[in-house]
Amino acid sequence: MKHLNLILIILILSCCPLHPVYAFLDKDIRLLTMKDGLADNTIPCIYKDEDGFMWFGTDNGLSRYDGKTIQNFKPANTYVSIAAIVRLSDDFLGIVSDGYLYYFNRKRETFLPIHTESDTAIGVFNVLPADDSSFWGISGNRLILCQWEIQQGKEEEKTAVRVRIQKTFQLLEEKGEVFSSLCYHEKAGSGIWLTTNRGNLILFHPDTPGAYQKIPLTDGKTLQVTSILNRDGVVWVSTIGKGIVRYHTKSGHMDRISYGGTGKENLLSHTDVYQTIFIGNNRYLAVTWGGYTLLMPDEKQPEELTSEIYNNTHTQIYRNLETRMISACYDPNGLLWIGTNGGGVMYSCLLYTSDA
């Protein structure tokens, strides 16, 4: 493990001097593609584990990068598109694919079979870890709390995961309304934020499940949500076609960041936003179908945002870069990782010297 950390430190240092001033992908950019060993060049999700490994969920399995080499894994000998990667415990990653959750033992580098009470797979489209033996999941119009444990077999290959639904919550009354994403409230123990395909934002309190709060984000029209983030009193809802919808938790005010708006505070690189992440220094980054956008508070009006759009198709080193960006992950050490639709993974250091 020390060897891995050393490799990643060298990667960071070779990428950029550690000074807290931000640069972006115009010049210093690296690429990982199938030529480097990726399972596929379309990357719907990215995750960094506590040991420093980078995990890329691709359209054809799971890829792990240690800063030097790439190793690929699949739960079966079939074409598997991975939608999400989450930490379930020290040893296990949860891999969401085609509406089902797979367990991957990252220490033993293998997928484990799953057993349920009814021997029927539990369908989930998104997962939120509760602790090292349970998780929240959204399954259609249900919010479920599941508990899991390892069942040790007499032989290692017979070891499996036992999963059971502990609680089920029916929060949606409208026919055809289903959940689309979820995240924790930024204040620990304050609840779970959920979004629906009918444009509703819901704050659910596990201790008082009947007292949930519903906030309409649209006028009843459908809303395709790709991700949700709650930080610094704002819920960021990334969408397809509607840009980013923001809900301010203290005031109840809502605003929208969109493509083609007037003024710096209302501009994105594209209306299809796949993920918005926090990158430090009060800045956020949105990856879209047409590049990415840096969002930051306006100097004169901090409650408003200014934006900088990056959609260059080439740098000093690479030509015809893929600008259809669909996932992102920021390493606090300074590395930004962006997954694309067909162009592999881009990564770059966001730090540079102010003297440069």
Language-model-derived ranges and their functions:
Residues 1-356:
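Carboxylate-rich, polar loop motifs that coordinate divalent cations or form catalytic acidic clusters
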